[in-house]
Amino acid sequence: MKVYVNGEILDEDKAVISVFDRGFLYGDGIFETVRSYGGVVFCLKDHLDRLYSSMKSLKIRQSLSNKEMEKAVYELLRINNLEDASIRITISRGISKQRVFNISQNEVANVVISAQSFIPRPIEFYEKGINADITHFKRNSQSLLSRFKALNYLESIIVRNEAIPKGSFETIFLNEFGYVCEGTVSNIFMVKGNKLMTPSLDCGVLPGITRKIVLELASYAALGTQEGKFKEEELKDSEEVFLTNSLIELIPVVKIDDRRIGNGRVGHLTQKIHSLYKELVKKEIKN
């Protein structure tokens, strides 16, 4: 497999960065994960807009323009002969031998892009739904990092691995005020009546690209939307619950902890929204 590193496409065993890279040493960087369908990267512009906005906010010096990044992504797909792929764009602040808190304006970002064949989740996840659990660890709604896809995923890794022995696919965070926040790698949605609800960004939620799309699609399913603050019991009392991210699209949740969601089956509105999402993907590929 070939990997893009700072303007070069290299064999993966030759794709290296410095031991003084700030992303490696301090988690000083950000990333985006995108998915391609038939060789077309879905919502790449949205992901790159978020990436470059984050770089600007975090004062990470750009080494590629938005258009150059897009070109690099497609070139990597072409060279690796990939059509349905998961792609990760990783940006670190660059190389620095200075102290951790000293950010030099001369540092240029390291850019690494990797791609591999997309491995879909088991079909039964979508047909029968998955289990999730709620961790006792809390997300900080006031954290600077809640707005960014930062490299440091240690918190999510720890709580996700605690969930595996329980048979849970995903772990859900509440924030410090006890409001539903997000999953370790997903945004969360609830359906009650004809309303689609999701935690508001001020709960400490990552502004997910798929989250944004689902909110836009809701009207086509005759659903109203509400972004707000919801307690754990409100989540568990929902008629339907589903998770979103760019790789899984939408996955229904039928049990949280030991509590069945709705009738314990995949909800028809979840299926409707997922169908609309798939239609949008097909439309973008066709265009």
Describe the residue ranges of each PLM region:
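Catalytic-pocket segment enriched in acidic/His residues
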Residues: T184, G204-A222, D258
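Glycine-centered loop/turn positions within well-structured domains
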Residues: S186-N187, K212, I248-I251
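Glycine- and Gly-Pro-enriched alpha-helical subdomains that act as flexible
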Residues: Y179-L201, P207
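Conserved alpha/beta cores of soluble small-molecule-handling proteins
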Residues: M1-I172, E176-Y179, E216-N287
